[in-house]
Amino acid sequence: MGFDFGCLLKLCSTVLKPGGAPGPINYMEIGLNLIKIAAPYIVQYLGIMERPPRVDVEEFFQQAEVTEGFKPWEAPTHVSGTFRALFIGINYYCTSAELSGCCNDVKQIIATLQRKRIPIDEMSILVDERGFPGANGLPTRDNIVRYMAWLFGGAKPGDVLFMHYSGHGTHTRATSDTEEKFDQCLAPVDFSTKGCILDNDIFRILLSGLLQGVRLTVVFDCCHSGSMLDLPYTFVGSRSLRRSVAGHMQRIRKGNDCAGDVLMISGCADEQTSADVSNAATFGTGASGAGGAATQCLAYTILKVSNLSYQDMLIATRDMLRRKGFTQVPQLSASKPINLQQKFSLMTTFEVDPAVAT
């Protein structure tokens, strides 16, 4: 697949900069007034990719020390620590891998967090859409790794971290993972020339040194994302599981434990594709235009329903996708066996289910 960086730069008005928003930005208004500019609903599959080069993690942590985000809005402070967030949306303009709604997903999820008055202290945005308000740069391989290092860097007990990715996910043949035949990958905007980002490297950046008392939530709205973080515990329950039936977490992987409280919500299982819809307004979030099905369902669930448990949140998202005719099944995995009846939150640490074998 060819990649015309010149074409992309013509479409994008944002280049890499240290950070800082050009004044207050009303993301709620943006999220509620998305203009339909994209192609009809289509699922694209990149296929099995060549194994990418490994990431020099230490180099990017050094770069992250001089990387900054910005405070997007005023909200009651998260008193126990700092709330830091990273948003990545990639439409792959001017390539055969072009998608239509990934940057809209970023607008929608930010608008959702603003409407819920989530107290974000520092935020960074990587998108390839021209004129995206507050964007820090393009979602190149180097930038994504650098900003993931920024997100994690210096996190201490009481801090809250959030990351949302919407774009292509793919996989490559595993070389050392004895439990899986494939490693999952994120596809940056320049993946055809620079390579993808392995799940092993994402784990090394975000999770390997995470301290106890740090809360991290990661949302992947992309194909083959069910085990993108290689977390040890996952939600167990059939696609048709009802809210009245108690589900549970189960250890599916030995090793890859981390001290922090990590929740991953993915758009689909490893073997599935994640859909891009042409009319997000049908999901009732107030948005119009193209957007990822899983992102729209999650945003709707967070906005419209209060006091959901972790299990209820996942089942509500799955049910909405099923009613809309999608076959993908969103997944929930974690660093610890969460008590799934605990109230869903982006900020609190987990209650552990003592019945789950560790």
Swiss-Prot record:
Statement: the UniProt record of this protein carries the keyword Calcium: yes
Compartments reported by the entry: Cytoplasm; Nucleus
- Pfam families per record: Peptidase_C14
Q: What is its EC number?
A: 3.4.22.-
Entry GO CC = cytoplasm; nucleus
Does this entry carry the keyword Isomerase? Answer: no
Q: Region Important for catalytic activity: what ranges?
A: 1-84
Regulation of protein activity: Activated by Ca(2+).
**Where would you say this protein principally sits, based on its record?**
cytoplasm
Single GO MF annotation: cysteine-type endopeptidase activity
Q: How is it modified after translation?
A: In epimastigotes, the unprocessed enzyme appears to be the main form. Auto-processing is dispensable for catalytic activity towards small oligopeptide substrates.
- EC supergroup of this enzyme: hydrolase
**BP terms from Gene Ontology:** proteolysis
Name the keywords, alphabetized.
Answer: Calcium, Cytoplasm, Hydrolase, Metal-binding, Nucleus, Protease, Thiol protease
Kindly identify the residues recorded as the active site: H168, C223
Family (UniProt): Belongs to the peptidase C14B family.
Q: What does this protein do?
A: Cysteine protease that cleaves specifically after arginine or lysine residues. In epimastigotes, may play a role in cell cycle G1/S transition.
State the name under which the record lists this protein.
Metacaspase-3
What species is given as this protein's source? Trypanosoma cruzi (strain CL Brener)
What gene is this protein translated from?
MCA3
